[in-house]
Amino acid sequence: MVVKRTQTDSRMQSTPGNHNHPDAHANAAYMTPPSMGALNANNSNSQLSTLTISPMTYLANNTSTDGSFLKERNAQNTDSLSREDYLRLWRHDALMQQQYKCAAFVGEKVLDITGNPNDAFWLAQVYCCTGDYARAKCLLTKEDLYNRSSACRYLAAFCLVKLYDWQGALNLLGETNPFRKDEKNANKLLMQDGGIKLEASMCYLRGQVYTNLSNFDRAKECYKEALMVDAKCYEAFDQLVSNHLLTADEEWDLVLKLNYSTYSKEDAAFLRSLYMLKLNKTSHEDELRRAEDYLSSINGLEKSSDLLLCKADTLFVRSRFIDVLAITTKILEIDPYNLDVYPLHLASLHESGEKNKLYLISNDLVDRHPEKAVTWLAVGIYYLCVNKISEARRYFSKSSTMDPQFGPAWIGFAHSFAIEGEHDQAISAYTTAARLFQGTHLPYLFLGMQHMQLGNILLANEYLQSSYALFQYDPLLLNELGVVAFNKSDMQTAINHFQNALLLVKKTQSNEKPWAATWANLGHAYRKLKMYDAAIDALNQGLLLSTNDANVHTAIALVYLHKKIPGLAITHLHESLAISPNEIMASDLLKRALEENSLTSGFLNSKYVFEDEVSEYMQQSNLNTSDKSMSMEDQSGKVTESVNDRTQVLYADSRSEMMMDDIEGNVSEQR
């Protein structure tokens, strides 16, 4: 089809009758889009949106001088419509009713008649709806259409992205935004027609190109620029938040600094609050609570899935997994195809040990959405839950291959290596995650934990410090920093980290039981400073949270031995051996405690009494410790969603074991 440049009728050359109407200039652009050279920022229609070039918008805004609508808006009266407008409405309605052959048939005719770039844009939209991106690109790049219309340029670049021609798309869009040379003038045009500015959409598309070229720094800047150009460009905001390209503080700063000046006070508060729902749930709790309350007060929004999901996120951070499941289940009952809910829902099921539900959900997702990355994440989490690690790894890998930007899949893949002690592969996978998701602290945290397992304390400290620089509100991170300080014999720093971790747990977690190991770590640090009373208090706190922890009983016994109170030490060592009869350290300490006790209370009498007590306790070897899980704070998003809490338990519990030393003060790791 050859695009003809024919003269349109006088009706197509006009503007709305009321020239003071705020969309008058925009509607003029619909009629006669400005001719522009290649990305000429001084002569562009990039400040407009596709609303401007919609035939429905034009007819709706084309009013008479007294403000009454023209009779052309009456669908039953089309006598006064020109042939071109009649064809445009026909094409548009066919497109809205998914009658794409009809829309293409009519669209080709109106383009032949008018040669208007806007008609070319809508015909190309029809081709895009059928997945024929090559044909759409061919149409938009002939006759220099993309140089005459920003809408055509944007859509041509979009087609090239869909065709994986990254360099071609970048050539059309430009490596940087050419329209931002005069920011003051640009800001005046933000709300010209109420839609999303094409300039913002092109910035977003430029970010997509850089993302696929693995240039994440440039991609991040493009997404941020898209939002600064037009705060309504939600796609750019979602890329920044869901892919963790910004730190938690950077996310909040961006939302607060967006240009809301062109909105009313109420609309600005509404949009800002909507965006806040997507941000990190640990920092800025007061602002988040106010945003939730404001949106909940709006009639109908209390049922919004985004608002409910925000509440579920907050509960997940507080380890209230049953409450999380109640909310996510409610959302899925309303909309079972809301895939954004599944990462959090699956993580909570894993935390709760719901193997059967994970199995059913995984099968359902495989049947309904085999092409989605979250489907294979669900399968991987199920296999992780039943301890089939190799199968879990395979499906995590499949999920990350289908969507390379899907954070939970990458972290689950890395965790599967960590569980089996394959540290090199785990480090490689975590490093990839750190490169992809630059704004989240979790990959650096896991890298530090891996190097600590390998005994590389200096490297572990570097990664943990990098993690802390990104996010300071994760108690697990603070615990690990304390362990590093302990291993460097910096006991006061270790105590500070452990105390800060426990304060944060008290503030943000409803379930403190998983953090018994941190109390034990604090007790060990106090013991090393010979602050024995403080050590016993901390260890007893850990014992209250985890009554069946043999390590804590052994640690308390060790402190009592230091205090020369062998009788109480023996009592706790009996408890330890009753829980874990094969505990070598407890057995050795018991022998020493018995020897020391015999010197003060009579060797012969005490010897047989204590030996009888040990025998009695060792008969209780069938006692089982409770299965503990330590969930992590959820970052913007759902990078880990605690897909592998077993790894975290291994590290957390090993902290107490690693920090146990014998009575002379030498550290003896018990793994």
Swiss-Prot record:
Q: How is it modified after translation?
A: Phosphorylated.
Q: What is its main location?
A: nucleus
Keywords attached to this entry = Cell cycle, Cell division, Mitosis, Nucleus, Phosphoprotein, Repeat, TPR repeat, Ubl conjugation pathway
GO cellular component entries: anaphase-promoting complex; cytoplasm; cytosol; pericentric heterochromatin
Q: Where in the cell is it found?
A: Nucleus
Spans of repeat TPR: 83-114, 117-142, 150-173, 198-229, 234-257, 268-296, 306-334, 341-368, 373-402, 407-435, 442-470, 475-507, 513-545, 550-579
What does the comment on domains in this protein's record state?
TPR repeats 1-7 mediate homodimerization while TPR repeats 8 and 10-13 bind to hcn1, burying its N-terminal acetyl-methionine.
| UniProt name for this protein | Anaphase-promoting complex subunit cut9
